[in-house]
Every structure is written in C-alpha cells, then in structure tokens.
Amino acid sequence: MRKLLLAVSFFSLLHAGCEEKKTETTVSADVNQEREELLKTYSQVPDASAILQAGDTGKAVYDLCKQRYADQLNALKKEAEAIGAKLIVTILSPEIGESVTKSTREGIPFIMETAAGLGLEAYDLTTPLAGYTAKQITQMPLDGHWSAEGSKIVAALYQPVIAAAKGVTSSKTYTDAERPATFGDLDPNQDVALDGGKNIPYQLVTNSQGLRMKTALVFPKTKQRVLLLGDSQVYSPFLDNDQIFTSLLQQQFPDTEIMNAGVIGYTLDDCTGLLTEKAKYSEPDLIILVTNPNDIGDFYFTQRNRMARSKKTFTPTSTEIALYQQLFGEKK
C-alpha cells in the first residue's frame, strides 16, 4: 500500500504542474460544440495505471491506446522522413524506485518494440536513472519535475545520443515565404518570472520563434539542427533557461543548434501536429522524441478532448465509455 501511495503522490505532483503550466502556451482556443458536450459529460481523466488496473475492460482500452500510440508514432516517422530528418525515440521519466507505476513497467517494452518494428533507433533512458533517488533528480517533495542536478544527469544521458548522430543532415529547405512566424507553441519573446503556483520561481525565456531557447534561428542554417519534441520533461518547468538540459547540451555541442520545442502536457498527437504545422520549418536534421509510458494512456478519449493541441473532437468507443462508467459511475 505504501508503494502505491508513493506512486500516486509522485504522479500527482508531476501532473499538477503540467495542468497549471498549460496556460502559458499559445494553443488555439476554438470552441467545438460536440467536444464541449463530451467534456461536460465525461469530465474525468484516468491515468494509465488506473486504466491498467480496471480488469478486462481496462486492458481492452489500454490495448486500444497502444494501437493509437503505434499509429501516431508511425505518422511522426513519416513526417520526419518527408523532410529528410532522422527520428530517434527516447524514453525518459522521473519515475524511479517506489514511484514507478504499473503503466511505466508495462509501457517501456511496448514503446521499445514499437519503435524497433518501425525501424526507429530507440533508447530507454529510464534504466540509468534507476540508480538515483527522486530527491536527487527532481524537485520532490514539492514537484516531480527535474531539479537542477537532475537536469545535468539528463543532459549526460542525451550527450552520447546526439554525439552518435553528428553526421546526420537533411537537405530540405524552405523559403522565407513558406516559413511560419513561429516553430514552437510557446509565446515568442518571453522573459518572465514564473513559479507555477508552487513557490518554485524560475525564469522562462523564449526566442522570437516560440522555442524555449534564447537565440533565434537564422537561415540558411550553418550548423546541424537537433529538435527535441515532448512534454514537460523537455520544457523543464521550475528551472531557469540556463539550467534546462537542452541548454546544457547546447553548451556541450557548440557546432549544433539544440532546439527545445517542449510544451507541458503535450502528447505524441501534439508533437506530430507541431512538427507538421510549424517545427519542420526550422529545418531539423535530427528529431528526438522524448516520450514516456504514461503517453500511452493519453490516447484515452477524455484526455484527448481535454488537452489535445488540435482541439479536435474525439468520439469515444463503446469500450471507452464502459471503462469510464466502471471508473467514475454511470452517465445518463
């Protein structure tokens, strides 16, 4: 029981910050009537572990979410291939020790196998993190995101991944007329002090193109460009720009431009949409997806309707509704 409580506590601290910080991004606020009705009727969002623990119905829904994850990873691969960029999958999570959830244990091998099946290079970076405690690498007990020390450790994990891809290049270019004003979904030109409502102050700096970095990208490019896509693990709340792991990597690779396109709460769906609509115009040579097993559960319909970047309407299957009723009660 103690292990379960620790896991739930860690997950809550990690995702409470995610929900708060979502408001600091520029995401469309278009209202869709059908989607609004679904949000009103089905307001609860179960995490992946709750889905897995819901018996046969939960397993059926989790299998559905896994298929959606696999399909979306394939879509991301195709988008990367279309611009001549190499896509690498990395699994990264601050869940370690007693905080490791059932979804993490089951999700890691699935993601690795799915990536391999698509012919993608993949790295499980959770294994080397297992030697640390949550207090060593995160802001626990206040928050479950990376601490300054944890950010250094994460940067060290990504250093060999980027070094091994030193010669990777893409010849795809775009004209000034084709490029959008921003390549990321954060508000551009920010230099603001935030605390996420947790009294953990940090300075957020974004460039003129909506990425969490201080310098703007110029064209034509003269260096290899590495684009990191992901959620809060990439964005790194509660750390100043100089402390986040992408900035530390930039210091280690001065002949490479490291681009942080992370947005708190973003899913694999969102990352694919961001690449297609904006980020590809930054002309990346290497794209690193930062994912974790909880991203699988993000393909449940209530999560997608509530948080999806696209603001599309995701109509639930009968099995998804059955799970919702099982977890949260009947909806008339």
Question: Where is each model-derived feature located?
Answer:
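Short, well-structured alpha-helical segments in soluble
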Residues: 273-282
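Accessory beta->alpha helical hairpin/"wing" motif in late/C-terminal subdomains of nucleic-acid enzymes
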Residues: 147-149
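Short beta->alpha junction loops
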Residues: 260-267
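Serine-dependent acyl-ester chemistry module
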Residues: 19-113, 125-136, 212, 243, ...
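Membrane/wall-proximal cationic-aromatic binding patches
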Residues: 24, 29-56, 69-70, 74-77, ...
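Sec-dependent N-terminal signal peptides
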Residues: 4-12
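Conserved beta-strand elements of the Class I
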Residues: 225-229, 259, 287
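C-terminal motif of bacterial Sec signal peptides marking the signal peptidase cleavage site
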Residues: 14-17
